[in-house]
């Protein structure tokens, strides 16, 4: 019985250690792909990075989750292309919204701010 308990606890410890190693937390923008850094500098020029979470899957980087000081949450794929922007405390910059969608929103929802967009 003790041996079974030891094996179960060992397996749980190894599993927890492996899961913990799948996410890296930093504030260093140099850990982001150049494409993501350029995107942030272009569309959020006056906002600082509060936290970067780097998700790793199978030994390689899978995605990046960037939290800005203004509360915006930006998600990027492993190549640095944005996949989702959640700006609930502010609004999504107009420069990110495709022109056809921006025109549609302006015509049909003129008083509604865009707070979330994804691809």
Question: Which residues make up each language-model segment?
Answer:
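Interaction-mediating elements
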Residues: 21-119
């Amino acid at each position: 019985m003790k041996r079974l308990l030891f094996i179960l606890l060992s397996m749980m410890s190894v599993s927890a250690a492996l899961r913990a190693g799948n996410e890296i937390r930093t504030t260093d923008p140099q850990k982001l792909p150049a494409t993501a850094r350029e995107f942030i500098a272009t569309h959020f020029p006056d906002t600082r990075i509060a936290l970067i979470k780097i998700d790793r899957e199978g030994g390689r980087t899978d995605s990046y989750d960037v939290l800005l000081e203004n509360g915006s949450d930006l998600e990027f794929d492993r190549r640095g292309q944005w996949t989702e922007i959640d700006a609930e405390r502010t609004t999504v910059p107009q420069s990110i919204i495709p022109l056809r969608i921006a025109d549609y929103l302006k015509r049909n929802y003129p008083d509604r701010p865009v707070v979330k967009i994804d691809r």
